[in-house]
Amino acid sequence: MAVPARRTSKAKKNKRRTHYNLTAPTVKFDETTGDYSRSHRVSLKGYYKGRKIAKANAAK
């Protein structure tokens, strides 16, 4: 079983972890529905690229 020969220092550990982060989702304003939605996805009202392609789910 592989075991590290030496303990990893805090600096080395933190330098490795600099890229462990989350990115905010891209959000665009949809002129058809008038609300914001994520890019390249169908809006909650069933629109994609300004065209109605799906039925919207009715909220209960």
UniProtKB/Swiss-Prot annotation:
The UniProt keywords, alphabetically, are: Ribonucleoprotein, Ribosomal protein
Q: Name one GO biological process term.
A: translation
* SUPFAM superfamilies according to UniProt: Zn-binding ribosomal proteins
Output the Pfam families linked to this UniProt entry. Ribosomal_L32p
Q: Which InterPro entries match?
A: Ribosomal_bL32 (IPR002677), Ribosomal_bL32_bact (IPR044957), Ribosomal_zn-bd (IPR011332)
The yes or no answer to whether the keyword Ribosomal protein is present is yes
> Cellular component GO terms, alphabetically?
large ribosomal subunit
For molecular function, the Gene Ontology terms on record are: structural constituent of ribosome
By its UniProt entry, which PANTHER family does this protein fall under? 50S RIBOSOMAL PROTEIN L32, LARGE RIBOSOMAL SUBUNIT PROTEIN BL32
| NCBIfam families, sorted | rpmF_bact (TIGR01031)
Question: What HAMAP family does the record tag this protein with?
Answer: Ribosomal_bL32 (MF_00340)
Family label: Belongs to the bacterial ribosomal protein bL32 family.
Record's protein name: Large ribosomal subunit protein bL32
**Which lineage is the organism of this entry classified under, starting from the top rank?**
Bacteria, Bacillati, Bacillota, Bacilli, Lactobacillales
